Curated annotation (Swiss-Prot):
GO terms for molecular function: serine-type endopeptidase activity. PANTHER family: TRYPTASE-RELATED. Expressed by a subpopulation of hemocytes. InterPro entries: CLIP, CLIP_sf, Peptidase_S1_PA, Peptidase_S1_PA_chymotrypsin, Peptidase_S1A, Ser/Thr_Proteases_Immune/Dev, Trypsin_dom, TRYPSIN_HIS. Belongs to the peptidase S1 family. CLIP subfamily. Residues 107-359 form the Peptidase S1 domain. It is found in: Secreted. The record marks R106, I107 as: Cleavage. Disulfide bonds join C31-C88, C41-C72, C47-C89, C137-C153, C279-C296, C306-C335. This is CLIP domain-containing serine protease B15. It comes from Anopheles gambiae. Residues 1-19 form the signal peptide. Induction: Induced by infection with E.coli or S.aureus bacteria. Induced by infection with P.berghei parasite following ookinete invasion of the midgut cells.
Length: 364
């Protein structure tokens, strides 16, 4: 803590208080960073984004210059000669169009998902060797540039190379990139992956798979439309505090079906939430210990997420919008086994880390 205070004092003494980007706001006022990200004008102590930059062992003159561009005003404090600089603290927020299901009636219990029903669903394609490119995991679009998936989809197979993320996949066995429905031409959309950031505490050798979450930054922005749009993240405390047990959640993906073969088409299934303690007792026989950062969902005979669904979204509908609640992590060896639920990474527990990755690592 003393080191952080020293860094803050040093930075404040290095940055001319008059060197601003033309803003003169009050604490708590909305602002915009030079990159166009919405934020709030805050003192350094209230902005975890800035504090993490200051605490970086690689803090440099470049970072000082960058922090100077964030200055948005001054805070006058009684008994203090110099004002406290206010910085535009970026806030990650959901897209206004997130979670909207514009099209389609839903078809449940492992049936095909109608086009546009879950437009945030992503399919990850890998080079697995011998010039073979195949889909192996799922993901969920959360903004124009970022996709959430499971860490084991990027860490556990070091010989696999993640090539691109596909949206609006209608049939993996079809060679046609576009199809026509009701006189409308609808095409697959592929985006190269610029960077892969698995959670730093994920351990591929831990069979309990804690921290099984990963952020993919795409090489270019995704253009939203009726068939490709982001899902909402559970920033709202009211969403985070909703009950889990006996509530209904939806999983979507292209994983194995009841005949043990990958599905050519996107499917989804509805599953109930379970007591955490009960789930822990079920998996204890396999020496698996689950934390409060994991969710237990399912355990119905014949209905489950499965191999190939890994990294895909666990969703719930709240007030007409869809929220990303979990990420498919692991389950029983034989999918859909009665009383053996699937395990999912609890997204709400990782929102702070996600903000750090999406904002801080862009500049350090």
């Amino acid at each position: 803590m003393r080191w952080l205070v020293c860094l803050i004092v040093s930075w404040c003494s290095l940055v001319p208080l008059g060197a601003t980007v033309g803003q003169s706001l009050n604490s708590g006022d909305p602002c915009q960073t030079p990159s166009g990200t919405a934020g709030t004008c805050e003192p350094v102590k209230n902005c975890s984004y800035v504090r993490k930059i200051l605490k970086s062992p690689d803090f440099s003159h470049y970072d000082t210059t960058y922090l100077d561009t964030l200055k948005c005003g001054d805070l006058m404090v009684p008994m203090r000669k110099k004002p406290i600089p206010l910085l535009c603290c970026p806030k990650f927020s959901n897209s206004p169009t997130c979670g909207a299901q514009q099209l389609a009636d839903r078809i449940y219990f492992g049936e095909e998902t109608e086009r546009g029903a879950h437009p945030w669903a992503a399919l990850l394609f890998y080079n697995v060797g011998r010039n073979r490119t195949v889909p192996k995991c799922g993901g969920a679009l959360i903004s124009e540039r970022y996709v959430i998936t499971a860490a084991h989809c990027t860490v556990d197979k070091p010989n696999w190379k993640l090539l691109y993320v596909r949206f609006n996949e209608f049939n993996t066995s079809s060679a046609d990139n576009c199809t026509t429905e009701n006189d409308e031409v609808i095409c697959r959309e592929d985006y190269a992956v610029e960077s892969i950031v698995p959670h730093p505490e994920y351990d591929m050798h831990n069979i309990s798979r804690p921290n099984d979450i990963c952020i993919l930054r795409l090489a270019s922005d995704v253009t939203f439309n009726d068939y490709v749009r982001p899902i909402c993240l559970p920033f709202d405390p009211d969403v985070q505090q909703l009950p889990i047990v006996d509530e209904i959640f939806t999983v979507t993906g292209w994983g194995e079906t009841e005949d043990r073969r990958p599905s050519d088409t996107q499917k989804h299934v509805e599953l109930p939430g379970l007591e955490h303690e009960a789930c822990n007792s079920v998996y204890a026989v396999a020496n698996v210990t689950l934390s409060d950062k994991q969710l237990c969902i399912g355990g119905l005979n014949g209905s489950d997420s499965c191999r190939g669904d890994s990294g895909g979204p666990l969703m719930r509908e709240v007030r007409g919008g869809w929220f990303l609640i979990g990420v498919v992590s692991f389950g029983a060896r034989f999918c859909g086994t009665q009383n053996l639920p699937g395990v999912y990474t609890n997204v709400a527990k990782y929102l702070d880390w996600m903000e750090t990755v999406m904002f801080v690592e862009r500049y350090l």
